[in-house]
Design a protein with these regions (language model features):
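Conserved SGNH/GDSL esterase-like catalytic core that processes O-acyl groups on lipids
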Residues: 1-73, 80
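A structural motif corresponding to the C-terminal end of an alpha-helix
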Residues: 7-10, 74-86, 120-133
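Secondary-structure boundary motif
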Residues: 9, 36-40, 77-81, 126-127, ...
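Residue-level recognition of beta-strand->loop/alpha-helix junctions
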Residues: 18-21, 90, 134-137
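A generic "cationic amphipathic patch" detector
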Residues: 30-33, 56-59, 77, 99, ...
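Alpha/beta-hydrolase-fold catalytic nucleophile elbow
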Residues: 49, 89-90
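Catalytic His-Asp segment of secreted/periplasmic serine-dependent ester chemistry enzymes
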Residues: 93-180
C-alpha cells in the first residue's frame, strides 16, 4: 500500500493493490498460492520479490530459476503483457540482521548465496525485458539498524518497506512508463 500511495502522491492513478504473497514463502509456495487464488485480472503494476526463503531453506538454484521464470511469466500476464509495468525486486540480505547474528549465521556465506539467487532473478528480468530494482545493497546497509527491522529482528519493518517503496516509486516515475 505504501508504494501505491507514493505513486498517487506523484499524480499517478492506481487501484488499490492486490497482495498475494505472504512472508515466508518460497517460489514453489507462491506458485501454488497464485494458482489457488485463481487471479484473472489485469493490473497496472506488478512487482515480484521472492527467493529469500528458497535460499534460507537451502533449496537449489536450479529449482529457483525454473520457478522464478514461471512466476515472472505470470507477472507479465498479470500486467496484460506490458513488460514495462513489471518490476522484479532483488532479494534483501537477512545475513546482517540481529536474527542472523543471534543464530550464529555467517553473514559472508549468506551474502554470497543471496547474491547467487539475485544473479538468477536479475538475469531473468533482463531476459524478459522487465524492470529490476536492487534493494539488496540498502538491506545490507540499513538491515543492521533496529528501526529497519520488525520486532523479530529478521523481517523488514514499515520503515524498511517505506525505503523500498520510495526506490520503486522513483524508478517508475523516472521510466515514464505510466501516464500522469
Amino acid at each position: 500500500f505504501q508504494l501505491v500511495n507514493l505513486l498517487r502522491d506523484k499524480n499517478l492513478s492506481f487501484d488499490d493493490p492486490k497482495i498475494i504473497a505472504k512472508t515466508g514463502w518460497t517460489t514453489g509456495e507462491l506458485i501454488e498460492a497464485v494458482e489457488k487464488e485463481g487471479v484473472s485480472a489485469v493490473f497496472d503494476l506488478v512487482t515480484l520479490l521472492v527467493g529469500v526463503n528458497n535460499q534460507y531453506r537451502g533449496l537449489s538454484k536450479e529449482e529457483y530459476k525454473a520457478e522464478f521464470g514461471h512466476l515472472l511469466d505470470t507477472a507479465i500476464a498479470f500486467a496484460g503483457g506490458k513488460r514495462e509495468h513489471v518490476y522484479v525486486l532483488s532479494i534483501p540480505d537477512w545475513g546482517v540482521t540481529n536474527f542472523a547474528v543471534a543464530n550464529g549465521k555467517n553473514a559472508k556465506i549468506v551474502a554470497e548465496e543471496i547474491d547467487a539467487f539475485n544473479n538468477i532473478n536479475r538475469e531473468e528480468a533482463m531476459y524478459k525485458h522487465v524492470g529490476y530494482i536492487d534493494i539488496t545493497a540498502g538491506s545490507r546497509e540499513l538491515g543492521k539498524k533496529a528501526v529497519m527491522l520488525a520486532q523479530d529482528g529478521l523481517h523488514p519493518s514499515a520503515e524498511m518497506y517505506a525505503e523500498w517503496a520510495s526506490s520503486i516509486a522513483n524508478e517508475i516515475v523516472l521510466t515514464g512508463n505510466f501516464n500522469v
